[in-house]
Amino acid sequence: KYHGKEYVFIDTAGLRRKNKIKEELERYSIIRTVTAVERADVVLMVIDATEGVTEQDAKIAGIAHERGKGIIIVVNKWDAIEKDDKTMYEFEKNIRNTLSYMPYAEIMYVSAMTGQRLSKLYEMIDMVMENQTLRIATGVLNEIMTEAVAMQQPPSDKGKRLKLYYITQVSVKPPTFVIFVNDKELMHFS
């Protein structure tokens, strides 16, 4: 409990390198991780600041991303590394490059040993939860889309121009939107 709200944390203990443990145990670990991610509202992906983003971190991030979860990248042991005025910027740049498919993920730098910034984690969890369940009115979405189209015209193919009619939000967790167009073949998946 924190400030009268209840939070349940599930520690998967991460995935292991195959050369460190047997494949059967690795398979079980993956199943546990996937199950924990599916149960979660927000995934706290803990990265060791002394190691950076590992292959296992990227796997867990991919699982959470594919399941549309809110994600907070928690960089632990921030107190254990040498820092200068560019350290945080460089670390974030590395995270964003490695996990480029999830630019929406929040990043937080903490120290479990000293307690540095741990209390702020609850505020971040609440904010991510709120963003995951946010509903945006169709009128507001259409205004944003109209402004975007005014700044950057949609592409055309062989003289046929993509027309965006309107956009609406169809679900939350994760927020999902549908855009109605004249020809879906002209619309890029991203």
Label each region the model flagged.
Residues 1-10, 14, 18-31, 35, ...:
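C-terminal-of-GTPase-core extension/linker across diverse P-loop GTPases
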